[in-house]
Amino acid sequence: MFDILMYLFENYVHSEVEFLVDEDELTQELTRAGFHQSEIIKALSWLENLAELQEGDTPYLCDHDQHSFRIYTQKEMDKLDVECRGFLLFLEQIKVLSVETREMVIDRVMELDETALILEDLKWVVLMVLFNAPGNESAYEQMEDLIFEQPDGRLHS
């Protein structure tokens, strides 16, 4: 399923090509690209659920204390290792993620089929969430920079 999400993001969203809105056409395109029907359905459902998070009816996206600290469930820790959780905290500290967008990212990660997520895949999920969350254009650009810009030279000496 994640491969399909990446395919859609890279070929339609990120490349700024007009996105096919007809689900049947999109399904046919993905089938021609070699993806299995069951995985296509899961990926499209994942995207629909991401869009539904924007409606604001999700309780954990509404009420929060600015000074609260996120405690991960065991299932979340199984899927997001220490490096991934640390990266999410880093993104919050540099204001790429808000409490709401962080929770959206975690929600979308937990819906993926993968038993554990690597950091590179998490970065793409963050990018997808920010792209689909209105008012986060600046955060999206910052996240793009974190993904695509490679540092010159060594970070530590």
UniProtKB/Swiss-Prot annotation:
Coiled-coil blocks: none
Source organism, top-level taxon: Bacteria
InterPro entries xrefs: Smg (IPR007456)
Similarity-based family: Belongs to the Smg family.
PANTHER family in alphabetical order: PROTEIN SMG
HAMAP family per the UniProt record, alphabetical: Smg
Protein name per its UniProtKB record: Protein Smg homolog
Source species: Shewanella sediminis (strain HAW-EB3)
